[in-house]
Amino acid sequence: MPEQAANEQSLKQFIGRDKGLDIRTIHALRILKRSIDARQRTIYVNLKVRLYINEVPQDEEFIRTIYNKVEGKPQVIVVGAGPGGLFAALRLIELGLRPVVVERGKNVRDRKIDIARISREHKVDSESNYSFGEGGAGAYSDGKLYTRSKKRGNVDKILNVFCQHGASTSILVDAHPHIGTDKLPRVIENMRNTIIECGGEVHFETRMDSLIIEKNKITGIETNTGKTFKGPVILATGHSARDVYQWLYDNGVEMEAKGIAVGVRLEHPSMLIDQIQYHNKNGRGKYLPAAEYSFVTQAEGRGVYSFCMCPGGFVVPAASGPHQIVVNGMSPSNRGSKWSNSGMVVEIRPEDLSDNSLFTEELKTKSEELK
């Protein structure tokens, strides 16, 4: 039951009765996995735990990655300081290479000032906003940790790296891990500090304007500051850097359109979602988190689904340029808002589009224009 799962002593007593153990021998327990089963009127919290019988834990709650010094090592240019770029830089350090991260936006703290101006003054800095800047689009729009991709890679390692840099170890446990917009900036700063302390570089307000191509080989980048950076290049530019994709297209780089999803963001009272999901007119009570939902259906043979559900959160203006109307959702770590929201989108397939591989970018641009 939720109230038992929330109290360590109650949990020890429950396990002792269930397994026939003297609870005095249970010196500690560690929750390894946690999920909520709300399919029936009686709500259960499913836990996987590790017991320490007549011993105290000696192991850490997360696995640390060793990052060695890379001064003087071959350098690799990483364009973009969102999650893709930051994790690419950390991985390069593991491989004994020196990352040089180039980010068009500002550092995560200065970026917050520009984001506040969007709501307060209705002014959008096209280089520093909800999409551009250290931490990428997720830094100030929720910090949810999940992937729909079937090519998942080592998700556990990613979560452990986040914990190593200050995220709560609850992300290793919860079925739907979430750091929270209020906690994530500090984690991102710590990741940047690791990169710099190991001998890497991070350059803010430095936009890649073009790739340097010599003898049909990429050898570096040119930036808006006039400075060039030489070395192999990793593009981690995210979904809003349309100028990058236009440059690649104009310079003959082979590109293929991918499907996208287009829709709206819905907002509901958190209490309403809690009442529905937890089958209780009084809502979630003291021991349950703000309720989530996931919606998937087919309409005329086309997928329609909810996306980026933010329980106990806010709808935020997420334009990355002037004359745009774009929104996103976010939740603080406690998910304590009286409102919940979710995207509701329909898939658009490549075959729906023109032969132009940039047509999805053009469609997004037109959809976001304020008219």
Residue ranges, per PLM feature:
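Residues forming the flavin
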Residues: 1-45, 49-140, 144-371
